[in-house]
Each structure stands twice: as C-alpha cells, then as structure tokens.
Amino acid sequence: MRTESAAEASEQYADIRSGLHARAWLYGTSTTREFIGGSKAVLKERAGNVPDGDFIAEAPEKFYFVSVDTEGIIGWQDGTFRKEGRPDAHVIEVLTEKTPLQYRSYLRERGVSYILAGKDSLDCREAVRKLGEYWGIEAILVCGGGTINWTFVQQGAADELSLVLAPAADGESETVTVFERSPLLLRPCPWSLH
C-alpha cells in the first residue's frame, strides 16, 4: 500500500531488511514482476538442448535476488537485478521440474541461474538447501508477497518473523496480504511462533 501514513513503516521495513545482513532476498512471482515492470518472458517454440538439473551462471555479485517462478513467466533481461539504494544482485530463479524447458533455455541465454525445487509444486526446504549448497547462502529474507510467505511458513522453511505494521487500511480485496494460502496447498496449516 502506497499511502503517506505507510511511508514511515516502509522506511522501517527497509532498515530492518538492511540490519539483518542477509545476502539473499526471496520474492514470489507477482512481487518480482512488480519490481521489473511486469515484463513477461517471450519464449521460443522449441527449447533446444537443455540439460537436466540446475543451472549456475557465472556472476560477480555477492547478493542474490531469488525469485520463485514455477510457471516460468518472468521476463528477465539479464542475470543482474539493479535497483537504486540496493546492491546489484545476481538473479536466481526457483523452478519446479514441471517448469517448461523453453523457460529454462530462456534463462540460460540471459545468464540467470535457476534451481529445481520440487516435482509438481514448490519444495521450499529443497530450495533453501540448494541456495545454501550452491551459493553459501545462510540467511534468506522471504519478502513476499503473501502467497510465498505462507508457503514457506506452511512447509516449515521459515524460522523467524519480522513484521512491520502501518496504521493504514484501504478495504480493497486486491490489497496485498502478508500471508495467503496458495490454491496449490490443499490443506491449511496452523502456525505459531515458539
């Protein structure tokens, strides 16, 4: 929500994010598309020869923008995420085995790394394991949206919660939520902090 009353909370959120010293930020598909202007991948009809498994592109960046995109729709121009006020970050896509080969080929051509985490649906624990194994990432900030936040919580892949609340409401049904169950997760799962 972009309101004047939420501006201070937004600044506090950025301060907390910086203070946690994580080298990786993780976002869901919709949030990532907002960051890159809604760009959608234009895929070739044929994938060509795409080897099985993960793809680790060469990258000088020591920060990582991790994007969960199991459908294979985000239109990256190259393998670096750039945003004023943040360090350049190497892009890592989290896909599943069912993500189209054409999209994997598209990512390879642009130097975007990707990992496969799950057969038909996202396996958050496998994603976290691979991010640690391949890039030495020990802490990941799962920054939204609500569906990816809840998916990590429900699968037991989140061990800490930092939540900033702003004194603002808009009453819109399209407003982004903090937690939202994915239709792919068939059963709700209660969660509490310990």
Protein language model regions, located:
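Enzymes that bind and transform nitrogen-containing heteroaromatic metabolites
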Residues: 1-194
